[in-house]
Amino acid sequence: MVQFLKAKNYAEGYTVSVNDNKFFGLVTMSKFPIVDDDHIKFNNDQNNSFLYTDLLIQNDTIRIYNAHIGSARFSQSDYEVMGTEGNFKTWPHQQSEENPQIVTRLANAYKKRATQTKTLLTHSYTSPYPVIICGDFNDTPVSYNYRNLTHKYIDAFTLSGNGTAGSFCSIPMLRIDYLLHSDFFNSYDYQTHDEELSDHRAISTILEY
């Protein structure tokens, strides 16, 4: 991936390892020099985290947050109980015991995401640089957490996106991945890519300032 993107600089942080040769976590790759970075796990779930990376672009520094906010970790049987068809692949960091109390698990997941999103935003507010936030937030645009995210930051989709821009492969109209930025930036050409390289589709936008 580093070679494909011609991104010689990268920062990474892992939350799960399998057999010491498979790692699940976050990575931010850049053609620009990285002057600082840190990987921070959330206190309420060590499987979820965010990675911030400070990039030097000419004489300017910007901060990128790469985040993975917690899901309810439903199994295939859970989706079947809810009447949703399809093959939902479960990744190692999503493993959980089957639990018939789906409503309870949903409620707990909402609370967990609210705490994690607040932690991420609180950290971002201390940034001395313009901010870009991207990642898997496991919440829809009508959620409480989305409203908090867009209170200060701009959702790039709202400027140049089209359609529903669904990013979760198994539920094509579900948009739970976001690219947000400070008003320091202008963004355009927002895209949701068709390739299914994981259980989510990649999203992209062009930023300028």
What is the predicted role of each segment?
Residues F4-K6, E98-Q101, I171:
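A short alpha-helix capping/helix-coil boundary motif
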Residues G13-V16, F23-T28, W91-S96, N138-P141, ...:
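A broad, low-specificity signal for short, low-complexity segments enriched in glycine/proline
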